[in-house]
Design a protein with these regions (language model features):
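Short, Lys/Arg-enriched N-terminal segments with co-localized hydrophobic residues
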Residues: 2-15
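Hydrophobic ligand-binding cavity/cleft-lining segments
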Residues: 15, 27-38
Length: 162
């Protein structure tokens, strides 16, 4: 069958690039949102125009009272380039290793001397530990010119700094 004239991927029906948000399951969204906003230089997402708070917005949409959160459950990149992150309340606690994690790049890459990269990574790890993160381990492979640290956010979600 000749498919040369067909749009197999369906791009004709998708006039713009797909956008996504990252969703992080958690027990208490507000402190986790504040942690990650500080970690990533994000900010808490302001309520939509015309609303003083997220609660007012959700109530206007008819969301039941028992489903309302604090409103401080989503963060955005102030530049608008990186994805929005939403912190979703779930009843269960984290039980196993994440299948997806964030890497926070602060070292400058391999063009930067390893000692400088190590200092940058360690300084960021200290900053995030002061915000509530836990240092889990150091990844340094001799001969591979690589240095990173593994950490957990305040609810135990793994992330790396490199």
């Amino acid at each position: 069958m000749d498919t040369s004239d067909e749009d197999i991927a369906g791009t004709e029906e998708r006039p713009m690039a797909a956008r996504f948000q990252l969703v992080i399951d958690c027990a208490d969204p507000e402190p986790l949102a504040r942690f990650w906003a500080a970690a990533l230089d994000y900010e808490l997402e302001p309520p939509p125009d015309g609303f003083a708070t997220w609660d007012a917005y959700w109530r206007d949409l008819g969301v039941p009272e028992e489903e309302l959160g604090t409103g401080a459950d989503r963060i955005v990149d102030p530049s608008g380039r990186a994805p929005r992150i939403w912190f979703q309340v779930v009843p269960e606690r984290k039980a196993v290793k994440n299948r997806l994690h964030l890497d926070i790049g602060v070292s400058g890459g391999r063009a930067v001397p390893i000692e400088t990269r190590r200092q940058r990574v360690d300084a960021e790890a200290t900053r995030l530990a002061d915000l509530g993160a836990l240092l889990v381990g150091v990844h340094e492979t001799e001969g591979l010119d690589h240095y990173a640290v593994a950490m957990e956010d305040p609810e135990g979600n793994e992330f790396d700094i490199n």
